[in-house]
Amino acid sequence: TFKIKRIYIMKKLFLVFSILTVSITVMGQQPIPVKPRILISTDIGGTDPDDNQSMAHFLMYSEMFETEGLVSSPSYGHGSKQNLLDMIDLYEKDLPKLKKHIKGFPSPDALRAICKQGRQGAAPFKGYTTATEGSDWIIKCARKESTRPLWILVWGGLDDLAQALHDAPDIQNKIKVYWIGGPNKKWSTNSYVYIVENFPNLWFIEANASYRGFITNDKQPGKFNKDYYDECIRGAGYLGKDYIKYYDGKVKMGDTPSLLYMMDGDPNNPQKESWGGSFEK
C-alpha cells in the first residue's frame, strides 16, 4: 500500500490544455487504466465563480471517472446544491453531441442522484459541528467495498470532509484527498487545522499554486489570452454559452488541476509529473 507523509506542496506544473470544444482530442496523455472513483466537494455558487468553469470541464470529461458524489460545500457565500443541478441541466442538453465523439458519459439523472447538500458556512473553531447530507454521503461512499480508494477532490473549504472524518475516522484509510488550497485555506481555517492535527496520516495533497496556470494572461501572444473565449468557447454548446457568465468568459478554472491530476499520470505517486502537477513533501 502506498503511504507517504500526507501534506504536499506544489512543486511544478506543466500544462497544455484546451477546453470546451465539442470535438475532444487528447494527445500525449498517459491514460489511467481504470476509472478512478471520485467525489467532488465544491463551493460552486459561493465565493468564486471559477467553480462553474471547472464544473463545465468535469462534465465534458465525466466519462473518464466513476463519479460517486457531487457535494455543495460553500464555506462562504450562497452556494447550494441547486447550482450543481443547474450545470447538469446544461450538460443534459449538450450530451447528444458529446456522445457522438465518445461513449461512457453518465446519465444526467445519475449525476443528479449523487448531488448532496453540505455545510453552508464555515465550521466553528473546533473544526466540525453537526453532520450534513454531504458529509454523510462522503462516509457512505468511502465505506463501499472496493479495492480502489475514493478520491475526494475539494474545490472549496474542507468543512464537510472534516465533519465526515470526525464522524467516521475509519474512512481515513479509504480516501485520498486532492485539495485546491490557496485562498480556500482562509475560508475553512478551522476545518483545515482540525484535519491536520487529528489525521496526520491522511493521504492529502495540498495544491496551493496549480490554479495559477489556468488564469488568463492578457499579455500572452496567440489565442491563450483574453480572446480565448471568443475563439474557442463562444457558442460551443450550452455549457459554452453559459461560460460567459463567469468572469465575462475569461478563463480561471482554478479547480481544474484536481481533475487533470486524475486524468493523466499515476495519481498514487504525487512526486511524478502529471497534468495536475507534481508534488514534494
Name each model-derived stretch.
Residues 1-30:
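Bacterial Sec-dependent N-terminal signal peptides
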Residues 29-281:
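N-terminal acidic, glycine/proline-rich low-complexity segments
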